[in-house]
Regions:
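Short, small-hydrophobic-rich alpha-helical interface motif
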Residues: 40, 106-115
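Acidic surface patches and DE-rich sequence motifs
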Residues: 37, 69, 132
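Nudix hydrolase/Nudix homology domain
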Residues: 1-16, 87-89, 99, 126-128, ...
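Acidic, metal-coordinating catalytic segment for phosphate/diphosphate chemistry
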Residues: 20-64
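Conserved Nudix-box catalytic region and its N-terminal flanking loop in Nudix hydrolases
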Residues: 48-64, 68-109
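A generic fold-level signal
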Residues: 27-28, 58-60, 68, 134-137, ...
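A short coil-to-beta-strand element that immediately follows conserved catalytic motifs
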Residues: 117-126
Length: 202
C-alpha cells in the first residue's frame, strides 16, 4: 500500500505540473484587454474570452479604420467567426486595443504593411460608444485614403467590394453591413468627401 501511495502521489504531482504548464501556455496566448470606466479611463484589464462570457459587463476600447479609394469605401466580408456581426460587410481593419497598448500603436499594428507607407496617414474621425446585446465598446474611428492600385492590393481579401455612398445607402438595414458600420455610415456619408480631401488632398 505504501508503494501504491507513492505512485499515486507522484502521478498527482506530474498531473499538476502538466495542468499548470497548460494553463500558463493558455494565459500567454490569451488576449488581455483594458477595462474602461464610463469616462473612458482604464481601471483594469481582463481576458477577452472571459469578457465575452459576460455580455456587456465590461467596456473595452477598439479601433476601426475606414478605407477610401477613388471616392468609394473599400469593404470586405467579416469572418463567420466574428463575435459581433459575423459574415457581414465592413472595413478591412478593426481590432481591440490591448492592455498597455496605445490607440496609435494599435492603428499601426492593425494596418500591417500599409503602416510602413509614408504616403498613407491614418486620420482620426470620431470616437463613440457602440453597444449591443453582446458588447460595449469605445470605438475610435479612423480613415485612410489609398491613392494607387498597389496600395489597394495590399489590403485585398476575399469578398471585396468598393461601394459608393448611394450604393451603400440602398442596402442599409438589410443585414448586409456590420452593426458598427450601420451606426457609422450616417457620419461617413456627411464627411466622406471631406475625409477624402482631408487625407488625400495636396
Amino acid at each position: 500500500y505504501r508503494e501504491l501511495g507513492l505512485v499515486i502521489g507522484v502521478l498527482v504531482i506530474v498531473y499538476e505540473q502538466i495542468r499548470l504548464s497548460l494553463m500558463q501556455g493558455s494565459l500567454k496566448k490569451e488576449m488581455w484587454v483594458p477595462v474602461l470606466n464610463d469616462n473612458g479611463k482604464v481601471i483594469g484589464c481582463i481576458a477577452r474570452s472571459v469578457s465575452r462570457s459576460l455580455p456587456k459587463k465590461y467596456y473595452h476600447p477598439i479601433v476601426r479604420i475606414a478605407v477610401v479609394y477613388n471616392g468609394m469605401l473599400y469593404l470586405v466580408r467579416r469572418s463567420k467567426d466574428e463575435f459581433v456581426s459575423p459574415d457581414t460587410m465592413d472595413y478591412p481593419f478593426h481590432n481591440y486595443v490591448l492592455f498597455r497598448h496605445s490607440i496609435d500603436s494599435t492603428v499601426k499594428e492593425t494596418l500591417g504593411s500599409l503602416a510602413q507607407d509614408k504616403s498613407i496617414a491614418p486620420r482620426f474621425l470620431i470616437r463613440y460608444t457602440f453597444e449591443n446585446e453582446k458588447v460595449k465598446h469605445l470605438v475610435s474611428l479612423y480613415v485612410i485614403c489609398l491613392r494607387t492600385e498597389e496600395q489597394l492590393n495590399q489590403c485585398k481579401r476575399r469578398s471585396v467590394k468598393l461601394g459608393t455612398a448611394k450604393q451603400i445607402e440602398e442596402n442599409l438595414s438589410s443585414g448586409v453591413f456590420s452593426e458598427y458600420f450601420e451606426k457609422e455610415f450616417a457620419y461617413l456619408q456627411n464627411t466622406i468627401l471631406f475625409a477624402e480631401s482631408f487625407c488625400c488632398g495636396n
